[in-house]
Amino acid sequence: HAGHVQQDPLRWGWPAWPKAYQDISSPEVTAFCTEQADEVSFYLWLQWLAYCQFAECWHTSQHDAMPIGLYRDLAVGVAEGGSETWCDRELYCLKASVGAPPDILGPLGQNWGLPPMDPHIIVARAYEPFIELLRANMQNCGALRIDHVMSVLRLWWIPYGETADHGAYVQYPVDDLLSIMALESQRHRCMVIGEDLGTVPVEIVGKL
C-alpha cells in the first residue's frame, strides 16, 4: 500500500491499484514481496512494535490493579480497500455496504461504506473468521466493546452505489455468534460490552 501511494496518491486501496496487484496470489505480488523484502519486513516490524507497546500498557494496568485496565473497541466492519478484503475476498461482500435504515434522526439512512461479512461463508467455515476476530481483539484487555452489537442479529445491507434507503436487513446466526462470544469472553477473561444505539430490535435486547 505504501509503495502504491508513493507512486500515485489516488491509489487509496487495492481496488485502485494496477490490476496485477489486486490479487494477493498473483505472480506480481509474490515478486514484489521478494524484491522488496526489507520494506515488507519493516512494516511487519512496525506492527510488532505496536503490539508490544499495547501489551506493555495492559501489563502495566494489571500491575497497578486497575479493575478493567484497557477497554478495546471492535468496529462493525473493515475498510473496503484494506488488507482484510484484499486477503480474503470470499468472506466479504464487496458489492454491498453496511449502514442504517432511515429513521427520525436520519431520514435518508446511513451508509458507512464498509463491506459486510457473508453470513453463509462464516457458517461454512465453522465460524472460524468470527472466532479469530474475537481472539485477536480480546488479547491484552479487560473489556471489549462491540460496536453496533445488533450486527450479530442483522445488518442493513446497501447495494454498492445505492443510497441507504434502498437497503435491506440480512440476518446472521445470532444464537451461535453470541454463544461463541460468551465462550471466548470466558477464555480470555474479557468483559463484553454491546453498543446498542440506533434502531434496536427487541430480539437482540432479550438475547443480550
Tell where the protein language model's regions lie, with residue ranges:
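Active-site pocket-lining segments that scaffold enzyme catalytic pockets across diverse folds
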Residues: W48-H63, P67-G69
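Alpha-amylase-like alpha-glycosidases and glucanotransferases acting on alpha-linked glucans and related
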Residues: H1-A55, G77-L208
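Ligand-binding beta-strand-loop-alpha-helix segment within the catalytic cores
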Residues: D73
